Amino acid sequence: MHLAIFVHRVEDVPPGLYLLLRDPDALDRLRAACRPDFLWEAADDALPLWRLAPVDVRSLSARLSCDQNIAADGFFSLGMLADFDASLQTFGPSFYRHLFWETGMVGQVLYLEAEAAGVRGTGIGCFYDDPVHDALGLHAHAFQSLYHFTVGRPVDDARLTTEPGYPWERTER
């Protein structure tokens, strides 16, 4: 699962579109599948992080996430890209669910790391698959966007409450 990262407000990282490559063997295939105008500049010496486009991606990020501002208002948002065709060809169609399990595990790590850093993360369940693929230049099914996530400062919503689950747990206030 590779991460297409839309960086908005990260200290020492210029805004833009990045790709965190989780499998170095996929680099050539991803480069060939993505837009030819991407830079593919190494963005970090310690991570397989590639700067694709040094541009303001806030409005694009929100648009791709069903026009949800949460994708643009945080530090960054990301789309998880599965090595789709190769996985299904190697392991069969039933492997599809394993790809989603992997996105869930990556999401859980992001939740935990965000909390440990004193910020918040949340999954973004609504995103437009085809426009995400178009933004990256992906036109075949080799790589597919399966899940999105964002990290930023928490926004408390007074409409959300926590109530006891059982009547005997309720106390008079």
Model-derived features with residue positions:
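Acidic, surface-exposed loops and disordered segments
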Residues: M1-R173
